[in-house]
From Swiss-Prot:
Residues 57-78 are annotated as: Disordered. HAMAP family: Ribosomal_uL4_B. This is Large ribosomal subunit protein uL4. Belongs to the universal ribosomal protein uL4 family. It holds the Pfam family Ribosomal_L4. Disulfide bonds: none annotated. Transmembrane segments: none annotated.
Amino acid sequence: MPKINILNQQGDFVSEKVLATTVFDIKPNQQVLYDVVNAQRAAMRQGTHATKTRALVAGGGKKPWRQKGTGRARHGSIRSPLWRGGGVTFGPSPRDYSVKVNQKVRSLALKSALSLQAKNNQLVVVDNINLATHKTKDFQQMLQKLNITSKSLIVVTQMTEQLALASRNLSYITLETASHASVYQILNCKQLVLTAAAVNYFEEVLK
């Protein structure tokens, strides 16, 4: 069974925890990871893009000139896609990009992502994260003691106002609760920082 050291906010060793093999030590399913990440990224899209077809552009109800006898090409509307100011052919319209993903697939993807980060030694477990102030400087000092200097995802079980304020000005830090952490977020970081409570949450939910 995999083991990991639990550190305090000063970066000192506190204890050792045995991680659940069914959550942090499975063989990552690459296809499931691909499918779920694609679905999660698709769900982020607004899908509000829109263009007007010839039916939606104002005007153009009158035939510009008669069909025959003028010597010019025949036209039925000045809003044809051939005309300047006309409609767009096969342009984008508002749509929902979200894709349904089954619960079992989502769970497997989450376990695969956690296992991948654990196997790559990119998992850091902290006993707890409590900040006395909301200052970014104090939070950054704590990160330096934990040797967290690259793009990281910090997962806690409960979001506090001080933690949210202290972390929001650091571009390389993403803060998320365990119940909302996505597979895409977990894979899209160099270091995954979990509190001990977050580890217990994942083991309980994904067992």
